């Protein structure tokens, strides 16, 4: 895990032998940060892979998929543009997440597929009566103000796990979940 505030940060990870490593570091951008991650992954003494060629795909969690993304998608230029267009809806999340995706592209190149999972996609089947606010409709059209629902990856996991435990078909399950 990397926590960064401007250029100073903390890099924390668990080694292949279970040791917890934590150190203060300088990280000027997402690419430099991701290079630290890959160095830890491939460290000869404590890494979990011999080299980066063992990594066959990369997954990203992005907070806001808006009305554009209803499912997980493979990263391409159109997806990057879509995520960028949604930065105003999640300025603290989508911008840095987009930087992370681009950093992975720089480090791994175009041959390693990347997938994006959107927190809002779980809730994307809400009908308009559930996601519309009692505000002028033009605000919805102009500013995309509506209920999106967040933490969908957690809600999906909880509801699928409950369906498995009950056992009930997930597709026929109506279940309140809280976060």
What is each stretch, according to the model?
Residues 1-69:
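N-terminal glycine/serine-rich phosphate-binding loop of ATP-dependent small-molecule kinases
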Residues 25-29, 33, 71-75, 89-96, ...:
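Catalytic cores of large soluble enzymes that bind and process phosphate-bearing ligands
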Residues 18-21, 32, 77-80, 133-137:
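Short, low-complexity, polar/charged sequence segments that are solvent-exposed and flexible
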Residues 22-23, 82-87, 141-145:
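Short glycine/proline- and acidic residue-enriched helix-loop micro-motifs
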Residues 94-173:
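Phosphate-binding/catalytic loop of phosphoryl-transfer enzymes
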Residues 1-3, 172-179:
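Single conserved hydrophobic/aromatic residue that forms the stacking wall/gate
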Residues 41, 47-93, 113-115, 121-130:
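Short beta-strand-loop/turn "lid" adjacent to the catalytic site in phosphate-handling enzymes
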